[in-house]
């Protein structure tokens, strides 16, 4: 919104700063963190009063988790407030990619909020119907992908079918055109990302730091892909307008830092599905917009690992009646093996950093 003040730069030279994505990204980070810091305590106290028993604790989970009983959930409301508030101030709201990303952020956040509400009121792990939840997620993601695809097709910078094509790392000109089916592919990427982060969010600080790492990585990718000079130099696909997504991701990082202040062990609040679905969906949307869906599987490899552990556990149990892991998602497996919560969290953070660096290195390998 504040970018519109650039028109007054003829009279106030300092307003030229608002032209620069880097400046607005930093400002969005600071603003979102400030929003969470300022309103966090009020939101936490309100949720604690309203929820009473807080988030239900799994009876079959690690024994150390029972001491967390009574901790309120829905902390994602703080994160959403920071992201949306900062984005409205600092991002270009006429940019289709920004609007599509915020649509997914808010839409997935609303789904997560309803899921959290059902779990808290029923004091049960069974919230929103899985099929209904996935169906609504696909509708929201599909709408976002459709409009982003149309925008990319209209730009025509890399051919008439670029917007509906999958790009591959290491090969700039190797594109597979999916046509209208790209909406399905993109929707799958976004929904998968949202639910992968949701599965990872099981320990204090476990999900939010890897999300910030992924957001920082994709902030770099979005900025480079949206700049024709850098894109040509690195031989990555130029996608006009995606640079503006760096501002939104700056807001994600700021909101994440603010939330981590309250989520650090012992957590005063959990983000719940409200936050995890929204954050994962946001990262997934940026990956689709920048044509780095495959690279997201590397940068977000930790989330992929968590998701695969659940798929393997459920599938193997249905076939054999036995379990591969002591408990899934896999972070609980390591807890059951005797790792402390802090050991699991910090070691997984290290993995996330390594995977992010590996993913970013693909930008130069052409």
Swiss-Prot record:
Predominant location: membrane
Localization annotation: Cell inner membrane
Recorded family membership: Belongs to the glycosyltransferase 4 family. MraY subfamily.
GO biological process: cell division; cell wall organization; peptidoglycan biosynthetic process; regulation of cell shape
Organism the protein comes from: Rhizobium etli (strain ATCC 51251 / DSM 11541 / JCM 21823 / NBRC 15573 / CFN 42)
Enzyme class: transferase
Gene responsible for this protein: mraY
Function according to Swiss-Prot or TrEMBL: Catalyzes the initial step of the lipid cycle reactions in the biosynthesis of the cell wall peptidoglycan: transfers peptidoglycan precursor phospho-MurNAc-pentapeptide from UDP-MurNAc-pentapeptide onto the lipid carrier undecaprenyl phosphate, yielding undecaprenyl-pyrophosphoryl-MurNAc-pentapeptide, known as lipid I.
Protein name: Phospho-N-acetylmuramoyl-pentapeptide-transferase
